[in-house]
Amino acid sequence: MEERNLRKTRTGKVISNKMDKTIVVAVQDNVKHPLYNKIVKRTYKLKAHDENNECLIGDVVKVMETRPLSKDKRWRLVEIISRAK
């Protein structure tokens, strides 16, 4: 049970739910530019497993790392933090 606590978690916004039991989550990171030392926003997309097809576009969700479920899918939905308005 302790091993699950070591898994990575990310919070992001659902940008697509067109696939069956799969959502695409956009996660935003703030990284420091190596030369200019400015904080730059970096966005990357993750495919996550949504077992019950309960997410809608615009929802803010928490995803957790898991074993590979398909070619691109290595994350699963933990909870829906807030619903789209």
From Swiss-Prot:
Keywords assigned: Ribonucleoprotein, Ribosomal protein, RNA-binding, rRNA-binding
UniProt feature coiled coil, ranges: none
An example molecular function term from Gene Ontology annotations: structural constituent of ribosome
CDD domains attached to this UniProt entry: Ribosomal_uS17
This protein's GO CC annotations: cytosolic small ribosomal subunit
Database matches in PROSITE patterns: RIBOSOMAL_S17 (PS00056)
Pfam families documented for this protein: Ribosomal_S17 (PF00366)
Keyword Iron-sulfur (UniProt): no
Gene3D superfamilies according to UniProt: Nucleic acid-binding proteins (2.40.50.140)
InterPro entries membership: NA-bd_OB-fold, Ribosomal_uS17, Ribosomal_uS17_bact/chlr, Ribosomal_uS17_CS
One Gene Ontology biological process: translation
Protein purpose: One of the primary rRNA binding proteins, it binds specifically to the 5'-end of 16S ribosomal RNA.
Family designation: Belongs to the universal ribosomal protein uS17 family.
Assembly notes: Part of the 30S ribosomal subunit.
Protein name per the record: Small ribosomal subunit protein uS17
Taxonomic lineage of the native organism: Bacteria, Bacillati, Bacillota, Clostridia, Lachnospirales
